[in-house]
Amino acid sequence: MLEKLIERVLFATRWLLAPLCIAMSLVLVVLGYVFMKELWHMLSHLNTISETDLVLSALGLVDLLFMAGLVLMVLLASYESFVSKLDKVDASEITWLKHTDFNALKLKVSLSIVAISAIFLLKRYMSLEDVLSSIPKDTPLSHNPIFWQVVIHLVFVCSALLAAVTNNIAFSQNKAH
């Protein structure tokens, strides 16, 4: 009797994630607002914007879109996996979610982080002259911010590769059984 009560209480705690999922949907609203603000800024300066600034603005919008997609993916998968099935939604609308297990979600998140990091580095590359001109010539490599941004990006890439290899090994072992 006590065991069943404890199990029911523990299982019911999954609903504590529901408010967090709702709060994450507010993050989407904020990202949408920032996206529209950046788009408006870009469009309102269309006649005077340089090609470099246009590319940087476009990369910023792509970055925000990736981030919004990442938030949505984690939000829906978390709700579906831990809180409740999304059975009120047309199943054809979320077919990807039905085939997304925790390992696949980790891989998608890792790849999204790599893409976001790559876009950030590309934006830095577009303004490389400004960044390098602000660094004294005798500065050691370890004090160069671009060096560390590339190192962090490579860590993200290696993490995503390791996650993919681990997922592939685990999937092939499960398939063999």
Swiss-Prot record:
Q: Name one GO cellular component term.
A: plasma membrane
Q: Which domain of life is it from?
A: Bacteria
Q: Which positions, given as ranges, span the membrane?
A: 15-35, 54-74, 145-165
Q: Name one Pfam family in it.
A: UPF0114
Where does the UniProt entry say this protein principally localizes?
Answer: membrane
For the keyword Transmembrane helix, the answer is yes
Record's keyword terms, sorted: Cell membrane, Membrane, Transmembrane, Transmembrane helix
Q: Which cell locations does it reside in?
A: Cell membrane
Q: Which InterPro entries match?
A: UPF0114, UPF0114_bac
Topology class, membrane: Multi-pass membrane protein
Name the family the entry cites: Belongs to the UPF0114 family.
Instruction: Write the protein's name.
Output: UPF0114 protein HP_0189
